[in-house]
Amino acid sequence: LKFIPCLNRVFLVAFNKQIAEELNARGLPSNATAKTLHSVGLSALKRHQNRSKVNGNKTRYILGDLMGGYNLMDDELRKTYFKLLSPIQRMVSLFKNFGYGAMLPYPTKDEVLELAAKYSVELPDEMDSFLKLLAETFEKSTKQLNIIDFDDMLYLPIKLNLIFDQSDFVMVDESQDLNPIQIEIVKKMIGERGRALFCGDPHQAIYG
């Protein structure tokens, strides 16, 4: 950092909150700051709509509503709900991480199956009804802005084309673990004449 001119704004992308706090505690130069991408996305969302509340169970509640309300389900329907909950949560999360509906069109049936196989998501046998419910859950999740989950902190700012604070130099550690939506955020954080440095090991990549 000492070789970067003091007039240049420097942003360090931290892999998690603890690392960001440690970097800032060390006493970064006045022109540098360290945050997670989730923090960056949440800041952009708050500028757009300050009333959003964070709830990690967002998909769970949406699925329950679409199936008639959890408290109104009989035992059989409740069993179906719990059978569908995990794969729908996983697939909705993957859709957001890859930018479907924001950077890419909604995935085809073949793309859903390919994504599920690649990330070991076990899908139910009743494929047509599952895909319909998955699409409805995803659509409602991406339109519900008053409640957001951790995936939304990254996904919604891109879908809504929100403005990010830009820096002259962006440094990204553990870049092999970035998913497509995170990469898009980093690109939007780079100033017009800015640069980025990505440090990572492709052999440890989560998203390939």
Predicted regions and their residues:
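Conserved SAM-binding loop
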Residues: 1-3, 171-180
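P-loop NTPase Walker
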Residues: 1-53
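Short, polar/flexible loop-turn hinges at active-site or ligand-entry regions and domain interfaces
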Residues: 7-9, 29-31, 47-61, 70-75, ...
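Accessory N-terminal region flanking or inserted into the helicase ATPase core
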Residues: 76-171, 180-185, 198
